[in-house]
Amino acid sequence: MKHFSCVVLSAMMLLTGCSSHFISDDTFRQEVTEDLSARSEILVSAGVDLDAMDMTRQEKEALEFLYAYMPLGDVVNKEPSYYLDHYRLMRKALKEMPWGKNVPEREMRHFVLPVRVNNENLDSARYVFYEELAPRIKNMSMKDAVLEVNHWCHEKAVYMPSDRRTSSPLATIKTAYGRCGEESTLLVAALRSVGIPARQVYTPRWAHTDSNHAWVEAWVDGDWYFLGACEPEPVLNLGWFNAPASRGMLMHTNVFGKYNGPEEIVRETALYTEINVIEHYAPESAAVQITVVDKDGQPVEGARVTFKIYNYSEFNSVAYKLTDAEGKTSLTAGLGDMMIHVSKDGRFGFKKVTYGKEQEVTIALEYEKGSGIAHIEMEVVPPVENAQLPDVTDEQRAENTRRMEYEDSLRNAYVATFFTAQTALEYAKKFEKKYFPDQDQRIADILVASRGNHKEITDFLHEADTKGVLSHAYQLLETLAQKDLRDTPKSVLDDHLYFGAEGECSLEHVACPRVDTELLRPYREYFQANIPSALADLVTNHTSLFVKWCKDNLTMLDAISLRYVQLDPKRVWETRLADKGSREIFFVAVCRSFNVEAWMDPVTRVVKYIDNSDMLVYDVDFDAVEQVVAPKGKLQLTYNEIPLLDDPKYEVHFSISKYVDGEFQLQNYDGSWAELFRQPREMDCGYYMLVSGSRMSGGNVFADVEFFTIEEGKTTVEELVMRDIEDQIRVIGSFDSEMKYTSVTPGAADATAVKSVLETTGRGYFAVALVDYGTEPTNHAFMDISAVKEELEAWGRPILVVFATEDDYRKFRAQDFNLPSTVHFGIDINGQMRDMIATEMKLTKGGRLPLIVMADTFNRVVFFSQGYSIGLGESLVKTSKAL
C-alpha cells in the first residue's frame, strides 16, 4: 500500500500566515457566505443568530463555514456556543502542539475543525481528550503522536460488534468497547482534539466476504497514512485489514463541506463531499465510464446510477452518481465485479460490470415496474489479494505487544468495576419479591449489559422501587436495546416511566422509548405539557388528522439532512423543522405520549399506528389525502436442498428487496427460509427482487436473481435457488471468531487465560475441534489429525482444540497423540462455544461431539464435521489446500 501526498507547497496557506480570515481564499469565502445565506430562514427558525454572538472575525467565519454545511440535526439540536467553544479549543490545540503551525488551512478546515465524524451523537469528548492527551504527546513528532493517540484509544476501548446506532466517543469509552465505526469515530475525535487532521475511511461493503469495515487516516507532515482504530501497530500504514483492503472495490470518506482536495470526488451534496480513496489501498484500480440510454438508444441526462457490491446476499448500494448531458458518469474501483443499476422516471436497467476488463459500458432503461425479467444467473468475482506491508522489526513488534498487554490491564481494571454475572444476580435478588416471578436472571442480564452505565440503571431501579413502580421500570428496561442500556441516562428513563401511559398499554408500541436508530431522549412530559389539548385530542381520537397536521405544519428539509442524525422530537415541535426520519420519529413519539400505539415496521420501515376508533392498523403516508390499510398478498418460496444447506438464512444466503421510486429496497427480515417463507407469508403488494448466492472460499459468488409481483389477495410462489458448484469450496455457515474460551497449556495446570478465538489464531483461516474425552469419535478424530501432522503443519494455520468441560481436559494426555505443533488447547466456557456452533450450523441438542470447523476470521465456515467421521484428517488437508 502507499501513502498519498495531498500538499502543493506553492498553494499552502499555513495557520501562521498573515491572513486575519478563517478562509483566506476570497472566492471560496464568498461561496460559503452564499451557501450560508441560502439557509437564513432555517437558522432563524432554529434560533441561530451568529451576529448576536461576541466573536472575532475568524471565529465568526469559522461558525459561518460550519453552519453553511452542517446537517439539520446539528443545526437544531446544539446551541451555537457549542461549536464556538470547539473552534476555540481547536485553536488552543494548534497553538500548543508542535505540529500546529504546519497544518494547512484546507486540512484544518475539513479534518480538524468539524466535531462530527460520522453519524454519532455529538458530545464534549474533545475537552476530555485534550486534557489527557496533550501532556502525553506534546514533545513527540507528528507521526509518533498519531501512534501514541491510538495506544491511548486502545487503553479505552476494544472491538465488539453492536447495532447500527453509533455511540458518541465518550459513550464508547464508558462502555470500553465499540464496533469498528465507533472505534474509528473515537480515534478521529481524539486526533482532531490535539490538532491532527484525521478522517474516517470505510469500505461500505467488502467484495470478497460479507460485512464492511471502517478505519482512520491521519495527515502527517503532508501525507495521509492509515491505521486501525484502537488496534495500535508499531508503524503507520499497517493493520489487520491490509490484505482484505487490497481486495476492496471502493474506499471512501465524507468530507465536511465543499472540498477541493486531490482525491476523486464521488459526489457533492449540500453537506459533504464524498471522496474515493481506493488508490491508497488497492495496488491496481480502474475507472469505468457508464452511459445511460433510453429504450431508443438516446443518452439520458440526470439518470441515477447506483454502484452495487454483492454483500449479505443482496446487491448493496455503495455509491450514487447522476449522468451528465451526454448520459455519462464514471467511478474508479478495484479490479472486480459490480452491479450497476440505473433509473429515471419509473424505468430502470442493470448490468454486471468487471472493472479492469471493461472501460465503457452502456446500460439502457429497458425495464419498468412489473417487467417480466427473465431468471438471471451470474458469477460475481472480487479483486485478487495483493497486500503491501511495511517493514516491522522483531523489536518493534515485541515492544508493541508489551504495550498492548499493559493497555489491556488498564482497561480491564476499569471493566472490573462493572457488574459481573454473579454480582448482578446478587443485586437482583434484593428485589426478587417485587419483580414478576422468576425475573432475577433477566434483571441480572440487564445489569451486566449496562456496562459502565450501571449506576444510571441501578439509580433508576432504586427510585422506581421507592415509588412503587419497580415492575414497570423493569418492563421499560426490557424494551431497550443493549446499547441503550449502555448510554441512556436516568433522566431519560424517568421521563418514559413516570410520564408514560397509565394502566395497560403496549410495551413495544407505547411504553418503549425507541422508534428507529435515534439517541433516546425525554419527550413525554414535554409533549403532555406543551401540546394544546385540541391537538392532543386529534392525536388520540383522530390520528389520521394528526398525520395531516404533520404534513401541513412541518417544513421538510431532507436536502440538508444526514442519515441517522435525527432531530430531537421536542425541537421538531419547537422549530417546525424536520426531515423524513425525524418526522417519523416525531409522529411516533407524540402518539406514544398520548397512549396511541405507533411504531416503525422493522421489515418495511413503514410507520404504522392503530386507530383508536376502529382498532385497525394503518400505514402512515404523509402525502396521501387519507390514511388507508395497505393491500396485502402472500409469498411462498420453494427450495430444493443442496448439500450442507437444508435451511438457507436470510441476509446470509438470500434476500428480498421491494421496488420503490426506481430503487430496490431491502426488506429487513430475520430468520431462515423455513421460518419465513416455507409457508405463505403476508407481504405488502408490490414488485420485488429475490437474490440468492453461494459464496465460495475464494470470495466469488454464484448468484441467482428472480423478479416477481405480489398481488392483493393472491399467493405468489417462487423458487429459492442456491447454486452448488462442485469443484469449488462453498461457504456453508458462520463461526463467531470473537467467541471466548479458557486457554490452557497441557502440563501447566494453572496457566489459564480467557481469550477470544481471534486472539489465538490471528487473522486468516483456522480450525476448531470441540471435543470430549475418551470417546471413540474423539479419539478417532485425534488419530486422523495426527496422521496428517506434517501436512497440517505445512498449512501453517492454528488448530484450536477446545474441550467441552474442564474435567475432559484434566483427563486428556497430549502425549497419547502426535498432534501438529500448530495445535492450541482450551476449555469451553459453560458450553457457550458448543451452543454457538450448534446454532450457526443448525444442529439439534448441541450436535454430536467432536464438532470440527474450518473457518476464517471473517466468520465464514468452509468445512464442518460432527461425530464419528472416517478420513477427517484427509478432509481437513484437502480443504486447506483448496483455500
Where are these predicted regions, by residue range?
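Hydrophobic/aromatic-rich core segments of domains that either
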Residues: 22, 135-141, 145-151, 160-170, ...
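Short active-site neighborhood of thiol/selenol oxidoreductases, capturing the structured segment around
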Residues: 756-785, 798-802
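Secondary-structure boundary elements
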Residues: 24-178, 211, 396-400, 404-575, ...
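Short, internal strand/loop/helix patches
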Residues: 813-849
